[in-house]
From Swiss-Prot:
Methyltransferase required for the conversion of demethylmenaquinol (DMKH2) to menaquinol (MKH2) and the conversion of 2-polyprenyl-6-methoxy-1,4-benzoquinol (DDMQH2) to 2-polyprenyl-3-methyl-6-methoxy-1,4-benzoquinol (DMQH2). Pfam families: Ubie_methyltran (PF01209). The gene is ubiE. It is an enzyme of class 2 (transferase). PANTHER family: 2-METHOXY-6-POLYPRENYL-1,4-BENZOQUINOL METHYLASE, MITOCHONDRIAL, METHYLTRANSFERASE. It comes from Ectopseudomonas oleovorans (Pseudomonas oleovorans). This is Ubiquinone/menaquinone biosynthesis C-methyltransferase UbiE.
Length: 170
């Protein structure tokens, strides 16, 4: 939060791309962007990152320490790339929750994983990273990949993630 005030009653601002916007408007602006690109998000990611996002995701999986039977939360999981990989690691005795605040992204991810037949141990939940609707100490691993940049109150999101992460979790 930049907390730039233009007077005593001005609302705090936060970043959105290359501009500052009132905090109350950021979630709406982010939602509009992701609703409009959901169907083409993976292609855009390939083009904009030169395919590097695939390496970053592989690196995330390798460092996660996730194994069979674990419970994983993938926040801002969108189209399900990480969730699919985690699903294979945790196996039938584990669980992956793909959470995304954006209904369009969540639908694309759910449809894609169902079409691939890898959604058997994946639950799809529309959720705000700042107010995760899960019990305390519930997950062995919590990831957010590129979604943290779109969260308005990053400190609240991190607190929420730590709350649902088991002691010793990653």
């Amino acid at each position: 939060m930049n907390d730039q005030r233009k007077g005593d009653h001005a609302e705090p601002t936060t970043h959105f791309g290359y501009q500052d916007v009132p905090e109350s408007q950021k979630a709406k602006k982010v939602a509009e962007v992701f609703h409009s690109v959901a169907a083409k998000y993976d292609l855009m990611n390939d083009v904009l990152s030169g395919g590097m996002h695939r390496l970053w995701k592989r690196f995330t999986i390798e460092l996660s320490g996730v194994r069979a039977g674990n419970r994983v939360l993938d926040i801002a999981g969108g189209t399900g790339d990480l969730a699919a990989k985690f699903s294979r690691l945790v196996g039938p005795t584990g669980q992956v929750v793909l959470a995304d605040i954006n209904e369009s992204m969540l639908k694309v991810g759910r449809d894609r994983l169902l079409d691939r037949g890898v959604a058997g141990n994946i639950e799809f939940v529309q959720a705000d990273a700042e107010k995760l609707p899960f019990p305390d100490n519930h997950f062995d691993c919590v990831t957010i990949a590129f979604g943290l940049r779109n969260v308005t109150h990053k400190d609240e999101a991190i607190r929420s993630m730590l709350r649902v992460l088991k002691p010793g979790g990653r």
